[in-house]
């Protein structure tokens, strides 16, 4: 009996250990509601709260459970653990495309989704509701009289001219851990070879590596970093302390991520999920659109320099295991320089 109990404990412990890890969980709406929408998302609660609040205002009696995870943990929850969520939201467009392509999303059409621009929908399964640029975030006070960079070439020259100032104080994504960071990095290499030169220069100055945009911005605020590269501009511009930062959209090209949503194939409340998707698309693309990003990040003025990442099977190229291993090996050589 004791042996059986020990074996059972090991099995249960093993199951707990393999469960996906949530960074944050919040509940909105009536605490005792039996009409609940479960959302799993890579977006911070503060970033997405306005959309949740506006939906609940139109759907009284509904509750929303909002779970924040990393992009890799999102994949684990949906694919490995078959968790029952109603809506899946992520900034990692390639991983979202893979979910839809591999049969983890259900088809959905409505009046709201029928009028979307071509770049905002793929196969009636994956829907984009924001356009968010990758930005260079700089500490205004930390730069002093040093001129701000306007392009990647400017940034390279700046780092080479002032190594004593920037050593250990430049940050970017750890693309081994961050799905969005990996997406941005691979798209940068498609746009220009300058990415590898910049990565080598940052690596030579002991670049600090981070999981997510919010941590990089916090590090710039605290003074641990002076520069954060490929940060989500939407996260920086929506902060109350945004005046402390210079948010630079590189003039050579600005990579633009589309945050996407899908309804998973096993959604327990698919009808409620459809209502939420309608709301999301209407607010994002309708005649009275209310973008989640700040108007100061209006991209229409920079259309010529935009490198807008397109949803579709082209995003799956760098998810091929051989290509991914080769990319990460080259990235580690450039950024770690061991």
What spans do the regions from the language model cover?
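A local structural motif
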Residues: 34-37, 58-68, 84, 166-169, ...
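Mature extracytoplasmic/periplasmic domains
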Residues: 264-321
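Extracytoplasmic ligand-binding site segments that recognize negatively charged/polar headgroups
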Residues: 42-43, 91-221
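Short beta-strand->loop
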Residues: 105-114, 125-128, 243-255, 265-266
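Paired acidic/hydrophobic, glycine-rich loop segments that form the ligand-binding mouth/hinge
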Residues: 85-90, 209, 226-231, 246-247
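A ligand-binding cleft/hinge motif common to bilobed small-molecule-binding domains
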Residues: 94-98, 221-244
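Early extracytoplasmic/lumenal segment of secretory-pathway proteins
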Residues: 19-98
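A bilobed periplasmic-binding-protein/Venus flytrap-type ligand-binding module shared by bacterial periplasmic
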Residues: 135-142, 185, 257-272, 288-291
